[in-house]
């Protein structure tokens, strides 16, 4: 049954992303045609302000507790984050961890392409340059390569979240994973799915070659009580009471360089996850005996609390302010309508704002190369 908590959560996130895309991100869209690097720098920080809202709602309104154990992050470092995909919402819950131990503005997520069509959420994800995939490697490889080369070219640090399992853990996906294991003589898993290593190895190789990778963060996520498997569970008010993250940091120098060894390395991490999660769910429902966060965060809890309070206040007032603006001023209504048309039309015509941004960067890069060639001839 749909609950008021779920409705409040979804409506608050939607209004924030919808009006934020139009009134906060929209004015900066022309900047991508002048300087894609500056456009990326500014919009990453604007999007990060919205990413604090789900964190604030989950913890301050719905009382979710976050526990982080393991190695933690070095603030500002460039990394690939690999995580088990227990629910469809793991990527959002990870923001509760990153707010404390890293910087939300650095995160990019690899997501299925259908999500970019969602008004508000999808528009903001396009502006944030998330990597949208079709889940067909022959179609995704060139897009992956172009986006990763872009991030390397502009020297903007990123922490790229990918789910090697490819989908969340359900009875159906576990059955398919077990069929795969049986055909290939592998162990059947109970708490994770067998990882698909092709995309992972490609991402690591690309970022490594572009000198844009400091470490790999292997994160195991678990929910000791209620598990919100889908968006419907959140709408029904089934929010996680506790979210546990166990972080293992591997400096890139310690990670294998060959493709075959990297595949085995990833598979080994999943074997460890299976055992770690087995101990978690069959034992004391914690990754560490204390059941408490043991990693010193890069931000104090007082600072995190201040960020959450400001976020909750701002994203409550902001939609009301935009409603008032639209009611009082005709130019705001014209701008509002124009931006909706632009967001919808550009995706129909060009496929997404991240592709336009990428094309602009490639154009400027080509022009720079042409100018450099002319200078050398002189």
UniProtKB/Swiss-Prot annotation:
The highest taxon in the source lineage is Eukaryota
GO molecular-function term, one example from the UniProt record: 1-acylglycerol-3-phosphate O-acyltransferase activity
Supply the name of the protein.
Answer: Lysocardiolipin acyltransferase 1
The species is Gallus gallus
Q: Which GO terms describe its cellular component?
A: endomembrane system; endoplasmic reticulum; endoplasmic reticulum membrane
Role noted for this protein:
Exhibits acyl-CoA:lysocardiolipin acyltransferase (ALCAT) activity; catalyzes the reacylation of lyso-cardiolipin to cardiolipin (CL), a key step in CL remodeling. Recognizes both monolysocardiolipin and dilysocardiolipin as substrates with a preference for linoleoyl-CoA and oleoyl-CoA as acyl donors.
Q: In which pathway does it act?
A: Phospholipid metabolism; CDP-diacylglycerol biosynthesis; CDP-diacylglycerol from sn-glycerol 3-phosphate: step 2/3
Q: Where in the cell is it found?
A: Endoplasmic reticulum membrane
Tell me where the transmembrane regions lie.
9-29, 46-66, 302-322, 336-358
Q: Reproduce the free-text note on domains from the UniProt record.
A: The HXXXXD motif is essential for acyltransferase activity and may constitute the binding site for the phosphate moiety of the glycerol-3-phosphate.
Example GO biological process term?
Answer: CDP-diacylglycerol biosynthetic process
Catalysed conversion reaction: a 1-acyl-sn-glycero-3-phosphate + an acyl-CoA = a 1,2-diacyl-sn-glycero-3-phosphate + CoA; a 1-acyl-sn-glycero-3-phospho-(1D-myo-inositol) + an acyl-CoA = a 1,2-diacyl-sn-glycero-3-phospho-(1D-myo-inositol) + CoA; 1-acyl-sn-glycero-3-phospho-(1'-sn-glycerol) + an acyl-CoA = a 1,2-diacyl-sn-glycero-3-phospho-(1'-sn-glycerol) + CoA; 1-hexadecanoyl-sn-glycero-3-phosphate + (9Z)-octadecenoyl-CoA = 1-hexadecanoyl-2-(9Z-octadecenoyl)-sn-glycero-3-phosphate + CoA
Query: A Pfam family this protein belongs to?
Result: Acyltransferase
Q: What is its EC number?
A: 2.3.1.-, 2.3.1.51
Sorted alphabetically, the keyword list is: Acyltransferase, Developmental protein, Endoplasmic reticulum, Lipid biosynthesis, Lipid metabolism, Membrane, Phospholipid biosynthesis, Phospholipid metabolism, Transferase, Transmembrane, Transmembrane helix
